[in-house]
Curated annotation (Swiss-Prot):
Record keywords, A-Z: Hydrolase
Enzyme class, first EC level, given as a word: hydrolase
Sequence similarity: Belongs to the thioesterase paaI family.
Record protein name field: Putative esterase F42H10.6
EC number: 3.1.2.-
Pfam family, one: 4HBT
Keyword Hydrolase in record: yes
GO molecular function, one term: identical protein binding
SUPFAM superfamilies the UniProt entry points to: Thioesterase/thiol ester dehydrase-isomerase
Highest taxon of source: Eukaryota
Lineage, top ranks: Eukaryota, Metazoa, Ecdysozoa, Nematoda, Chromadorea
Entry annotated with the keyword Heme: no
Length: 169
């Protein structure tokens, strides 16, 4: 329509990066002291968030290690699952999710005291699925220690993620 202008009530207000980060900090704080399997992410702290990327950090501690004294592969796989799902959850808030595929390649060892920077990228969000990848880097030298990929299906008639009540956490 010529001469038509949208009213300010029609405009969608996008959250700021600070608001997105604050939301993810609240979500990860809910994992602290969790009694379910998400407790493996209780030492993870979000540091940067966009609609397509979530960057977190974690200091590797003794409870994260395998018998050889390096970061346990199961810990890395679970963090790939949790952090990539949270990256999708930044924009997909009205749907439950389930893993369809999860794969991790382990490249270098990580030891106690190492700080990991974990970056999850949302590659594509479709009508029924989302595709992500994840990189684990040692902050001390920037070298990649692991690379993961995670495909998620959106569940019909399931609750979405709620920061307030910790649904799916």
């Amino acid at each position: 329509m010529v001469g038509h202008s949208e009213s300010s009530t029609d405009a969608v207000i996008e959250p700021t990066s600070e608001e997105l980060l604050a939301e993810q900090v609240r979500v990860f704080n809910k994992m602290k002291g969790s009694t379910n399997f998400n407790r493996v992410a209780e030492d993870v702290y979000p540091v940067e968030v966009t609609k397509s990327k979530l960057v977190c950090e974690m200091v590797v501690q003794h409870q994260h290690l395998n018998s050889k004294g390096t970061l346990h592969g199961g810990q890395t796989a679970t963090l790939t699952d949790v952090i990539t799902a949270r990256a999708v959850g930044v924009t997909v808030k009205d749907k439950g999710m389930a893993s369809v595929e999860l794969a991790v390649s382990y490249l270098l060892p990580v030891k106690v005291g190492d700080v990991l920077e974990i970056t999850a990228h949302v590659l594509k969000v479709g009508r029924t699925m989302a595709f992500t990848d994840c990189e684990f880097r040692r902050k001390s030298d920037g070298k990649m220690s692991a690379k993961g990929k995670h495909t998620l299906a959106f569940l019909p008639n399931q609750p979405g993620i709620s920061v307030e009540n910790g649904t799916q956490f």
